Regions:
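Phosphate-binding site of ATP-dependent enzymes
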Residues: 41-122
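Short, amphipathic alpha-helical "lid/cap" segments that border enzyme active or binding sites
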Residues: 13, 121-124
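Active-site nucleotide/adenylate-binding loops and adjacent lid/helix of ATP-dependent enzymes
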Residues: 1-63, 67-69
Length: 124
């Protein structure tokens, strides 16, 4: 779900609460490295999390939280087409793979990820 700075946050929060299950993730649409990202477990926290994300840019998305393993796969394009690197599993000590986990040593990576080849092929 998408919101712009200046929109009615109360109405937006009500829409999120009626359409998504908690937890949700509130993220700025600009930037990276998990700046401005908040994991929200209760609807009463939404407006504060959206305002926090607005510090990084004028638009914010709210996404359904999912549980499971954190897998990632880098890809690049060369003269032969799209190339993919091995799938990596990210294991975090934190509640989710946030800035602290990424840059302050609170995560580890397993490369290649210990997953079936069929799963790896689907990710790639």
């Amino acid at each position: 779900m998408f919101v712009r700075k200046g929109d009615d946050l109360k109405a937006f929060s009500e829409k999120v609460a009626s359409n998504l299950r908690f937890p949700v993730f509130v993220k700025p649409t600009q930037g990276g490295s998990s700046f401005g990202v908040t994991r929200v477990t209760d609807p009463s926290q939404l407006e504060e999390a959206v305002n926090y994300a607005f510090a990084e840019g004028p638009t914010v998305i709210v996404e359904q939280g999912v549980s499971g393993r954190e897998l990632t796969c880098a890809a690049y394009m060369d003269a032969q087409g799209i190339q993919t690197l091995p799938v990596i599993e990210v294991i975090t000590e934190n509640e989710y793979f946030d800035y602290d986990a990424k840059y302050n040593g609170h995560s580890s990576e397993v490369c290649p990820a210990e997953i079936p080849d069929e799963t790896s092929d689907l990710i790639k």
